[in-house]
């Protein structure tokens, strides 16, 4: 039995007068390259300008930290520059779905105003193309 395939239906103006804000997001590329590190339980993470995000979880958590010379670096995209209603649905899904279709791995952290989506630095060209084809704008 073959796995199901999924096609994303994009609503047109003929379907409905509303256009989802999730379908056309501006993603700003944050300066620098980042590494993902496991947060050690009980050890405080330095809160200097080099730490982008810290996530605490059942496993201890993780840290997104800037390290421009890292061998396995990640690039950070930010979707929080444009205001959107807090009850807007599908914001993150609209970003990660086209990347998943293209086999581009992601690591994500949420902030109050938006999401940080990390993609491997060696796959940025492919990721940017997938995102643009999905209707998003990627800007430096």
Residue ranges of predicted features:
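Regulatory modules associated with amino-acid/nitrogen control
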Residues: 2-105, 126-140
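A short glycine-rich beta-strand->turn/loop micro-motif centered on a GG-aromatic cluster
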Residues: 105-114
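Phosphate/ribose-phosphate-bearing ligand recognition and processing surfaces
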Residues: 117
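Conserved short segment within the HATPase_c
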Residues: 123
């Amino acid at each position: 039995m073959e796995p199901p395939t999924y096609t994303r239906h994009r609503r047109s103006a003929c379907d409905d007068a509303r256009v989802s804000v999730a379908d056309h997001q501006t993603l700003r590329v944050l300066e620098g390259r980042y590494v993902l590190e496991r947060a050690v339980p009980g050890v405080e993470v330095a809160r200097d300008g080099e730490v982008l995000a810290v996530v605490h979880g059942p496993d201890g958590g993780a840290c997104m930290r800037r390290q421009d010379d890292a061998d396995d670096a990640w690039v950070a995209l930010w979707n929080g520059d444009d205001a959107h209603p807090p009850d807007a649905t599908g914001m993150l899904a609209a970003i990660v779905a086209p990347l998943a279709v293209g086999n581009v791995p992601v690591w994500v952290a949420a902030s109050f105003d938006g999401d940080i989506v990390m993609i491997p630095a060696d796959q940025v060209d492919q990721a940017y193309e997938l995102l643009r084809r999905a209707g998003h704008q990627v800007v430096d």
